Amino acid sequence: MSTLTSVSGFPRIGQNRELKKIIEGYWKGANDLAAVKATAAELRAKHWKLQQAAGIDLIPSNDFSYYDQMLDTAILLNVIPQRYARLSFDNQEDTLFAMARGYQGDKGDVTALPMKKWFTTNYHYLVPEVESAAEIKLNSTKPFDEFNEAKALGIDTKPVFIGPYTFLKLARTPEATELELDKGLVNAVAAVYVEVLAKFNELGAAWVQLDEPYLVLDKEPGDVELFKTLYTKILSAKGNVKVLLNTYFGHIADVYETVNLLGFDGIGLDLNEGREENLEAVAKYGVASNTTIFAGVINGRNIWRNNYATSLGLVDALKQVTANVAVSTASSLLHVPFSTEGETGIPAEDLKHFAFAVQKLDELKEVAALADATEDEKKASAALAANQALFDGTRVAADPAVAERIGKLSDADYVRQPAREERQALQREALGLPLLPTTTIGSFPQTKEIRAERAKLRKGEVTKEAYDEFIKAQIDAVIKKQEEIGLDVLVHGEFERNDMVEYFGQNLNGFLFTKNAWVQSYGTRCVKPPIVWGDVSRANPITVEWSAYAQSKTDHVMKGMLTGPVTILNWSWPREDITHEEQTKQLALAIRDEVLDLEAAGIKVIQIDEAALREKLPLRKSDWHVKYLDWAVPAFRLVHSAVKPTTQIHTHMCYSEFNDIIRDIDAMDADVISFEASRGDLVVLDAIHDAHFETEAGPGVYDIHSPRIPSEKEIEDRIYEILDKMDVKKVWINPDCGLKTRGNAETWPSLENLVAAAKAVRAKLDK
């Protein structure tokens, strides 16, 4: 019998971001919901047929979503807070969008659900909110409709769900204690999954996949018992459906013995990020006789080609324990671009080193075929030989100048002088800012006109000189508008930048760029990460000309805007032939050069965004420092350690759980940090207070990911919440994040309310 192949999930935005475009058109009133549904159905059919043509045995369904799979699960379970239910939309999609984006209109005014990073990825999920009065019940036909959709095309699929354990651990359950979820809630959730399996029994599904990535985290008291309670109920009622427990982003060695005894038909193990521990657990505890191990050998989180010899070695190691081994993607392919097809900007000799989602289907099938081959057949295999050739020899030559510069670094290069308290006093005097200074995070809306002008430059339809004049006009206008509404520290708007990471990559040595390698970040927001191809260095100044021009146009303090080294790496496709630490040092030195040039050009405030610092923190607490923070935090210090005491260094961080690393963030030794905080109900304030946080801070006072406009009173209330926990002298007032993806129609009224709120609070404090 040939080795089964299984795909955990497939990208849903479409090869050309069709889903993004049709949904955003619906939000703007350019098309109706029927058009959205038609495009979605076309994409699903295309993606199923692609996987069928590639010969994949277990093709996923229900991995499609209009916005987010956790949000879909909340709706499936009827976990819809009353504030959204009361909007009384006549379709489930508009309720979903209101939960994801907030709503402000004739039906009411509600903020969006909180949004957080999905484990260590750059994907964001909506945090479900389980109200005490929630009636947990099966509330959606989506999984069954999509299964039948595929069946009508002649394709049998494997329905995929976020599992109940992960859902409950990630949901906000206000009435539950930290250690023990309400048993009524647990039983109700389990009952819905039982009902789901019963329906798939009726529909004739062979397999159902339940994703439980939360299993790879450290366990709290009661976690294992919760998992057992849920799955004892679910598996006892599974009927003829085979249940695949799928785990990813780490290992489950600490619970593998328990999982193995529960009676799952399949257990999916990540053999990229949890390789050694998972293999050791399987070797130690064996595999139940009726269980198939799904070996996650095809990495769902990178774009480099799979090393077949390595994958075959992993499959062979499992086959020493059990004959029941399938090969699978290590996680959903949601986190990689669609296809390398059409990437003509990358030389063919380089492109052959990459595999996007479509190419990973072929890799999966080839690994499965080779796993079934005899040793003689492997030796004769052209596919195996061609694959091995990619890993033999040197892919790219090293840059000796980069290595030499890193080799000369000393401990002093990672320490800024004088101490922060002394610097803060000097900076207050030098900058002359008021109490509760107001600023923005950096970017302003990139209108259709700006994007069109950039496209013209790319196509050679306008000269570089004409484009630069256009950008200068945008900068002039945004400076004037910021001055008019009364912001204290201004920014130039970043109109020259397509993306905060790609822009820097395009101006550094060592990067490759794609035309269409988009991946979903949240909802319809997509990103196109650059590829770290070789050693990184800065050839010329990148931002200095624009920042210096902007400063020349105002007497206000102008903030220089940079992306930090950890974020550039975390939001790029990193190399696999050298460590992340080494790549980050290279980037830190390149950005350090830019910081010093900005300072020399008269820029007194420089923001070095580390938006993605938290997201790559290892999932196991014991790994936090030794595998990440011990080099990530010093890399940031290396960037700014040589500036003058009067130069104020800012940083910014995006949606994350900051509380547990708040002291490490303080150790970055920035002068000011802004947090994305409003969707997290400002819980970071308690951590700042309890840690005696020394860095000045601006927890975001309104959510920029929602189109709604916060009132002056709403922002004023937020400021007082902040002042309850922070020293007023250390508080900055700013939005949650950059404003690039917002429209001018909501941006300026929101900022006017922000400035008015800050002034109102200042006035009351002065009395």
From Swiss-Prot:
Zn(2+) binds at H652, C654, E676, C737. Binds 1 zinc ion per subunit. GO terms for biological process: methionine biosynthetic process; methylation. L-methionine binds at I441, G442, S443, E494, D609. PANTHER family: 5-METHYLTETRAHYDROPTEROYLTRIGLUTAMATE--HOMOCYSTEINE METHYLTRANSFERASE. Its EC number is 2.1.1.14. Pfam families: Meth_synt_1, Meth_synt_2. Belongs to the vitamin-B12 independent methionine synthase family. Keywords: Amino-acid biosynthesis, Metal-binding, Methionine biosynthesis, Methyltransferase, Repeat, Transferase, Zinc. GO terms for molecular function: 5-methyltetrahydropteroyltriglutamate-homocysteine S-methyltransferase activity; zinc ion binding. It catalyses: 5-methyltetrahydropteroyltri-L-glutamate + L-homocysteine = tetrahydropteroyltri-L-glutamate + L-methionine. Catalyzes the transfer of a methyl group from 5-methyltetrahydrofolate to homocysteine resulting in methionine formation. This is 5-methyltetrahydropteroyltriglutamate--homocysteine methyltransferase.
